[in-house]
Structure formats: C-alpha cells, structure tokens
C-alpha cells in the first residue's frame, strides 16, 4: 500500500487560459426608420418591430403605419431576404403633452370591476394628482369608461384648448295637462327625443322625460310631450340633459373626444364629461353637443364658464394613459404610485412607458436625437408631408441634416409637386434644388397628390432586402417592383422630366405582348448618384469599420511596421487576392467581391487613372481595374507614431455601375 503524496499543480509550470476568438460583430443592418406624428409612439424613443404582425398589433391593422409597414416587410419581387426589422419614432409637428401609458391590462372587464378600491398619486408638471380611495372601477361599463372615471378622480385640467359659456339643462315655469307640458320663461336648452331631458318639479313623477315638442320656439319656450302625465301648475320645472348648449366660444375649437370642465370647479367636472358629437351650430364653435358623463347620467347645472381639452386619462393600446394638461418641453408626467398603480399596470415594473413633452421638432435637432438613441438603420422616411403640402422648407432641412452625416444615412423623400413632371428645369422643385446644391443622401421620389403608391416604403424595403451575403447579391433599385403598388407615371415625357430634375418614380411600361410596372431610375442626390451605390458604400464601410475594431480589440498590440500593416491588410482584404474569392468570404473586400459591391475588370478613364495613382503614390490603375480594388497603406510619420494615430489607409474599389437601358440595332442582311 503506497502513501499519498502531496503534489504541485501542473498549472504552476504550464497554465492554460481558456478563451474564445469571437466571430466578429454582425454589422449594420440597412433597415428603415419611419417618422410618424402618431402620439402612440412615445417621444424620445425609437420602437423596433420584427414583422408586419407586430406593427399591426401595436398601431392597428388599418393604421397608416401598418399600411406602409406592409409594403416594407414585403421586400421586392425576386428578393432573397426580407427586412429584419422596422423602426418608428414620433416627430412632433406641434408641441405635444407628456404622458405615462400603462402596460396592456390583459384582463377582462369583470376582473377590472373586481378592483374595488385603491390609492393612486401622479406627479405632473402642474402639480400632484391624487385619490386616496378610488372606488369607481366596479361602476365601469367599459375600459374606456373606467378611464373616464380615473380622469374624474385625477382632474388634470390646464387652461383648456377651447373656452366658452355653456348651458346644461334648463329651468322654466311649467304647466302640465296629461302628457302635454307647457314651458314658459325658459332659461337653457330643452332637448327631446330618445335622449330627451329628464324633468323634475312639483307634480312631475320620477323618471319623466321629454319626448317631443309640438309648438313654440325650438328647444325653448313652448309645448312639449312627456312620457308621463304631469300635474305641475305654474311652478318651477328643472331639466337635466345629455346635451351641452355652448352659447359662445371665446377661444379654440371643440373636438369630439374632448373633456369639458367647469372653470373654477363644479360638480359635473367630477364626472369627466366627454364630447361625443356636435348636434348643431358652428363646427367646433357655438352649438349643441352630445355629451357622456362617466356615470351615464345627465347634467343638472344651468350655466357655467366651461373649458374643453383632451381628457387627463384615456384608454389607449390596451392600457390607461395619463397625460399632462400642458404641452412643450416642460410638460411632464411621472410614473404613478399607490396601491392601485401596479394593479392596472401603471408602474414601470408592470410595463408602463413614459413619453416626454416636446416642443415642435426641428429636423436637425430631432434626427441627431434619434441617432443618439439608435443608429442601427440606414434609411428614413416621413409618413406625413413635413411642409403640409406646400413648399420644401422642412424637406430641405431634413436633406441638409442627411447631407451633414458623411454618407451614413439616406432620406427617402416623397414629393407631390407637379412641376418636375412638366419641364426638365423645374427650378422650384425639391429634386432640382438638391441637384444644384450637390446635397448628398436624399432620394426624391415623386407621386401625385393622393397617389398613395408608397414608393418611399418600397425604397426602404429594397435597401433592407439586399442580400449582401449572397454571391452577386447586389441589386439596383431600378426595375424593382411589388404587387399592389400603383404606377404614378405612364408618360415618357413626364418620366424624362422627372429624371432630369433628380426624381425617381414608379412607372408603367408596355410593348406588344408585355407590360411591366417598376421603380425607376433609382437616383440619389450627391456624388454617389445612384441609390444602390450609396447603400453599397454604407455596407462596405461598416464592414471595414467592424473588422478593424475587432482587430484592435482582439490583439495585444498593432505596431507601426510591416507586421502591423500586414495585419490591417489581412483584416480588410484576406481571401480576396487577385480578384478571386474563397468562400465563405474572410474579409470585407472578399465579401464585396462576392456580392458585387466591388466589381473587377472595369476600365478606368485616363482622368480616373491619374487621380488614383496620385492617391496611392504609385501606378495602381491597372491593378485596381483588373482586381476591382486596391488597398494603400502608407507608413506613418514619426509625429503620427508619437501620437499613436492612424497611418494613411485608403481603400479604392470599382463600383462597376449597372446597365439600366439597352439600345439595340436590328439589321436585316440580304
């Protein structure tokens, strides 16, 4: 039997440190961003959706956002991949209010009604709203009605978007004879019919309503028919009503969905009355409005100074939304607290989201804010006309921003201006202006007013559907199509004029025995000239950036010598020698050769040869032409080495273009 011997761990002499050499980063996805004015998207956030069903679930199947998303997620006819995601952000055309929107309730109305009591407190920019013993959910007849009860419990009324004087119900001297009721000295508005006023007074039975008017001033002094016989005799009759008679509107416009509240307080304010519809009068002004109190009852006041504005609490997207009564950058609503808040998903932990108040957006500032939140996208479009259908001021500001981003993003700009279809020099048109200024990165896309062909969404789909991983995956936007898109241009003259002014469009073409519809020609403003060339450089430059970042973060040191420069060269061009590609591609240049972003055997002009030779410091034009690329790494100076800055690294590559028109001669030889 041998004795146990204590030993020294082998790691003392040879220590193996496990590790993984990463496969690298996935790189930029050329997905689209859509700017909407829909307040359902929280201000300051960028929402990402993986597919059309997710967009429809959030916005609604018939929403504008869903209509554009349907075009986007369909890609284009013949594509081998579809967009991986779609982004949305809210662009406030005017100042907007802050809000907190609760997570989806995911409960039945009966389950909500079972919440019998609870406390809730909300801090807003105008003060603290609180109800220590909210008990109204058992009375709720719907989720929207539950929101109305919450609005009554948390009165969050600002100065109001519309103000006026209103009469609710009436008082009069009444005389009854059977079901005939004569009203004299009427103060207020008498309504009749299925939703007629409820009337009370001595000699008037309970639950008596006014059915019709037989004579007298309409809705004023006269003879009415009631559902019950009355014996009132020259005494006061009081009517309560579902209708609000707004006798004058001092400021603003009254809209359906607005909440009415008495200036300085009043009992009907506690019922959060909502405007259902306008019955008569000046649209949005003085007139009669059908209202709905939270308890389903009638108004019983006579005359008040009233303000109207959006309700403080609404039911949106399956959750309760609490909004500030003010708009602009100072508008604020904090996440609610109290025992009720988590039960109805109004806390951050239960899925509530916060939207900040904001002033009317400015394109450059807004887009910079979007990039600070999410920069993993390539194209953007607006689902609205930034200029409201007149002029180009705001569209040019978006174009100016994209021009300032060093070719990182493309603006897909829909324009309905008719003038670029009418002449080759439509000097006031957006495309012409961009062409004259050489502003880069905007894709002007023409469609007629009300055309609705969603060409910008197809352009975004094209960029997001190009399969850069496939051999010859590169594509042009020209000749791309999608079922259901209606052609905007059917005239060769109009098409030629649009092209001359820098626009693309969706066209219909035909010949004997054939007909086609497609996007054409695929231009982009600025030096890249073509939309496909622009997105190709986005992809290639991003791949180079990621490859070099992976190199720098994966090795101990990259020296300023042949070994260091060789590592850079291998990182960028490995597997791409002499124009050939070993699959799978091992480097950005190899991948570019494989997918067609880099094209070999393209001749250079004499002028191009001079420029590229000058950039490289030696004659490279023949090599560049033959293999499609050339990487120049010039040794760093002593000053550069001392500062540990970059050596001069220049990648030149041949785009190769694309044949988009064919003219052929057909000659019979006898």
Label each PLM-derived region with a short phrase.
Residues 28, 114-118, 287, 318, ...:
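Residues at beta-strand starts and edge strands
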Residues 1-66, 74-81, 520-670:
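Structured, hydrophobic secondary-structure cores that serve as assembly/anchoring elements
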Residues 141, 145, 159-163, 310, ...:
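Alpha-helical scaffold segments that mediate packing/assembly in large oligomeric complexes
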Residues 77, 144, 152, 371-557, ...:
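A glycine- and small-residue-enriched flexible loop/hinge signal that marks low-structured segments
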Residues 311-328, 332-343, 373, 379-385, ...:
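Extended amphipathic secondary-structure runs
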Residues 1-117, 343-367, 375-397, 402-431, ...:
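N-terminal polar alpha-helical/low-complexity "assembly arms" that mediate subunit docking
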Residues 74-99, 320-332, 600, 605, ...:
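Extended, compositionally biased
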Residues 51-59, 109-337, 397-400:
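Extended, beta-strand-rich, solvent-exposed assembly scaffolds of outer structural proteins
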């Amino acid at each position: 039997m041998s004795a146990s011997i204590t030993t020294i761990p082998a790691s003392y002499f040879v220590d193996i440190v496990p590790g993984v050499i990463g496969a690298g980063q996935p790189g930029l996805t050329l997905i689209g961003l859509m700017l909407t004015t829909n307040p359902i998207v929280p201000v300051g956030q960028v929402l990402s959706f993986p597919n059309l069903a997710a967009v429809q679930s959030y916005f609604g199947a018939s929403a504008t956002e869903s209509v554009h998303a349907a075009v986007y997620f369909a890609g284009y006819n013949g594509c081998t991949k579809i967009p991986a995601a779609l982004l949305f952000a809210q662009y406030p055309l005017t100042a907007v209010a802050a809000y907190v929107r609760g997570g989806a309730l995911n409960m039945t109305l009966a389950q909500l009604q079972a919440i019998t009591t609870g406390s809730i407190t909300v801090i807003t920019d105008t003060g603290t709203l609180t109800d220590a013993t909210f008990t109204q959910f058992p009375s709720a007849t719907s989720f929207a009605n539950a929101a109305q009860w919450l609005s009554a419990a948390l009165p969050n009324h600002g100065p109001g978007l519309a103000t006026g004087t209103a009469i609710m119900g009436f008082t009069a001297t009444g005389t009854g004879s059977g079901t005939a009721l004569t009203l004299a000295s009427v103060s207020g508005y008498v309504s009749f019919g299925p939703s007629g006023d409820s009337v009370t007074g001595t000699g008037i039975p309970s639950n008596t309503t006014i059915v019709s008017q037989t004579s007298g001033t309409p809705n004023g002094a006269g003879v009415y028919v009631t559902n019950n016989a009355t014996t009132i005799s020259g005494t006061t009759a009081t009517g309560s009503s579902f209708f609000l008679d707004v006798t004058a509107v001092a400021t603003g416009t009254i809209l359906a969905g607005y909440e009415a509240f008495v200036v300085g307080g009043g009992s009907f304010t506690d019922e959060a009355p909502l405007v259902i519809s306008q019955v008569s009068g000046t649209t949005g002004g003085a007139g009669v409005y059908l209202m709905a109190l939270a308890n389903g009852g009638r108004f019983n006041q006579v005359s008040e100074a009233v303000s109207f504005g959006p309700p403080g609490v609404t039911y949106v997207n399956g959750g309760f939304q609490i909004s500030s009564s003010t708009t602009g950058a100072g508008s604020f609503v904090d996440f609610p607290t109290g025992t009720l808040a988590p039960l109805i998903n109004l806390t951050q932990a239960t899925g509530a989201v916060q939207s900040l108040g904001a002033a009317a957006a400015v394109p450059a500032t807004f887009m910079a804010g979007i990039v600070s939140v999410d920069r993993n996208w390539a194209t953007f479009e607006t689902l609205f006309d930034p200029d409201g259908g007149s002029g180009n001021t705001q569209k040019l500001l978006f174009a100016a921003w994209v021009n300032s981003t060093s070719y990182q993003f493309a603006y897909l700009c829909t324009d309905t201006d008719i003038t670029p279809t009418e002449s080759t020099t439509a000097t006031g048109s957006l495309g012409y202006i961009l062409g004259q200024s050489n502003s880069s990165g905007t894709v002007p896309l023409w469609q007629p007013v009300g055309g609705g062909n969603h060409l910008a969404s197809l352009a975004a789909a094209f960029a997001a559907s190009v399969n850069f991983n496939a051999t010859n995956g590169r594509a042009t936007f020209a000749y791309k199509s999608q079922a259901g898109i209606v052609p905007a241009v059917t005239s060769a003259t109009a098409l030629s004029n649009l092209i001359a002014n820098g626009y693309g469009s969706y066209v219909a073409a035909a010949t004997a025995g054939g007909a086609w519809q497609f996007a054409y020609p695929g231009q982009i403003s600025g030096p890249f000239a073509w939309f496909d060339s622009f997105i190709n450089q986005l992809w290639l430059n991003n791949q180079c950036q990621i490859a070099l970042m992976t190199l720098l973060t994966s090795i101990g040191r990259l020296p300023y010598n042949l070994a260091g420069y060789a590592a850079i060269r291998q990182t960028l061009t490995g597997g791409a020698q002499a124009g050939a590609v070993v699959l799978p591609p091992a480097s950005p240049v190899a991948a570019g050769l494989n997918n067609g972003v880099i094209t070999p055997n393209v001749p250079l002009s004499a002028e191009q040869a001079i420029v590229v030779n000058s950039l490289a410091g030696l004659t490279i034009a023949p090599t560049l032409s033959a293999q499609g690329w050339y990487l120049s790494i010039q040794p760093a100076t002593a000053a550069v080495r001392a500062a540990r800055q970059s050596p001069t690294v220049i990648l030149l590559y041949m785009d190769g273009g694309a044949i988009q028109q064919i003219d052929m001669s057909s000659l019979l030889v006898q």
